[in-house]
């Protein structure tokens, strides 16, 4: 689960991280009211959407010469003018896709006198089985670009979970970020704080880009991105309250209600598969034969008829879907249950696109019989290769 920048900053501030004064606003009236309470004279107006690249983004409704989704203002009047221009508009960034995201809230905060911009993140390093700091002196830009062009400028430090962040760890991080004097003292306080927040709140990613050294020599968290482990949200009701459903795909929200692993993609062939590995293989072979998957959908190993029906409805709710491939290898999951769910769903929502079903494993003959006896226009397939070729051909011929 992702949260907005202003929510991430508030959370980190509760642990003691240094942030600027700021307030989230939802209207022009709120913007004017709260901007007057900030010290100024420099303000930053930030679009709040779940996507990066906001500063370089473009609003669909504005001209190509308009400013992006993060703007500086020299007065309260400029703040209000920017809010009026940005609020309710659709911001397109490299992470939103061409459809963009509507800006329903803005974050207004004090400006900062920046001396240097740094990069810092915490993540789970699966190669060593530890939480690791990833830092760089090249902040304020895409870390992927830094990794590609100047990988030597990235320093990774796995943390021993039994010891936590030690003074030696802090020293190594400070050295990597070239922190001195007041900034070094701030860093020695900040690193353990961030690690504690990451662990206690079950984060999957904590990214600060940039972490700045101000002209007065102190550190400040200038931007923050936080993601949480969905599997741990049951023990964090306070975090769940921060969820912004308007930022999520409605189909993914519906899938989560049925405990389905669903990710919307941009292709035309809907996929319903059991098992993440088989789901990825299914998407790969669809691409191999010249088409694109419309989604990743894993119904899991013990799905019921109702769960399968819900999964089918979610797939058919996507207007981009021109064909559906059901690929089931029954182990724990029984093929007859899948077949009953597919038949029930098709009868309920109708079938307006080609449907290919490949079943193998437990109760496969019963499953095939259920589909054959249903009278539905379903294309059977013998194996994965056969299934992929048939659905791609059906979609291209439609």
Swiss-Prot record:
Q: Which GO terms describe its cellular component?
A: cytosol; succinate-CoA ligase complex
A GO molecular-function annotation? succinate-CoA ligase (ADP-forming) activity
Cofactor binding, per record: Binds 1 Mg(2+) ion per subunit.
Q: Which residues bind ATP?
A: 46, 53-55, 109, 112, 117
Where Mg(2+) is bound, by residue? 209, 223
Q: Which reaction does it catalyse?
A: succinate + ATP + CoA = succinyl-CoA + ADP + phosphate; GTP + succinate + CoA = succinyl-CoA + GDP + phosphate
Signal peptide limits: none
Domain of life of the native organism: Bacteria
Question: What pathway or pathways are given for this protein in its record?
Answer: Carbohydrate metabolism; tricarboxylic acid cycle; succinate from succinyl-CoA (ligase route): step 1/1
The top EC class is ligase
Q: Name one Pfam family in it.
A: ATP-grasp_2
Could you give the subunit structure recorded for this chain?
Heterotetramer of two alpha and two beta subunits.
Q: Which family does it belong to?
A: Belongs to the succinate/malate CoA ligase beta subunit family.
Name listed for the protein in its UniProt record: Succinate--CoA ligase [ADP-forming] subunit beta
């Amino acid at each position: 689960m992702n949260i907005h920048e202003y929510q991430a900053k508030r959370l980190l501030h509760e642990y003691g991280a240094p942030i600027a004064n700021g307030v989230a606003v939802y209207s022009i009236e709120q913007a004017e009211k709260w901007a007057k309470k900030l010290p100024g004279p420099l303000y930053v107006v930030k679009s709040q959407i779940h996507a990066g690249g906001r500063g370089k983004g473009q609003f669909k409704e504005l001209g190509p010469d308009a400013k992006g989704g993060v703007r500086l203002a020299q007065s309260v009047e400029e703040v209000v003018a920017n809010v009026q221009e940005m609020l309710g508009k659709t911001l397109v960034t490299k992470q939103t896709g061409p459809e963009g995201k509507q800006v329903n809230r803005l974050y207004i905060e004090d400006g900062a006198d920046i001396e240097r911009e740094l990069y810092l993140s915490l993540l789970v390093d699966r190669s060593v089985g530890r939480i690791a700091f990833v830092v760089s002196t090249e902040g304020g830009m895409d870390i992927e670009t830094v990794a590609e062009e100047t990988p030597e400028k990235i320093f990774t430090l796995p943390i021993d979970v039994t010891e936590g962040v030690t003074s030696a760890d802090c020293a190594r991080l400070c050295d990597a970020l070239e922190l001195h004097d007041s900034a070094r003292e701030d860093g020695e306080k900040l690193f353990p704080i961030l690690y504690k927040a990451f662990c206690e709140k079950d984060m999957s990613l904590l990214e600060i880009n940039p972490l700045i050294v101000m002209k007065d020599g102190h550190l400040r968290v200038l931007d923050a991105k936080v993601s949480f482990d969905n599997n741990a949200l049951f023990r964090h009701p306070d975090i769940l309250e921060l969820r912004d459903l308007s930022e999520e795909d409605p189909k993914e929200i519906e899938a989560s209600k049925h405990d389905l692993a669903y990710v919307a993609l941009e292709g035309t062939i809907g996929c319903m598969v059991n098992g993440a590995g088989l789901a990825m293989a299914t998407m790969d072979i669809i691409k191999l034969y010249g088409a694109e998957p419309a989604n990743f959908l894993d119904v899991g190993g013990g799905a019921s008829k109702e769960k399968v029906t819900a999964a089918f409805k979610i797939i058919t709710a996507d207007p981009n879907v021109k064909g559906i491939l059901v690929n089931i290898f029954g182990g724990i999951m029984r093929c007859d249950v899948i077949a009953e769910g597919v038949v029930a769903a098709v009868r309920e929502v109708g079938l307006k696109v080609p449907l290919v079903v490949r079943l193998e494993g437990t109760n496969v003959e019963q499953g095939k019989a259920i589909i054959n006896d249903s009278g539905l226009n379903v294309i059977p397939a013998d194996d994965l290769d056969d299934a992929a070729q048939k659905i791609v051909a059906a979609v291209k011929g439609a």
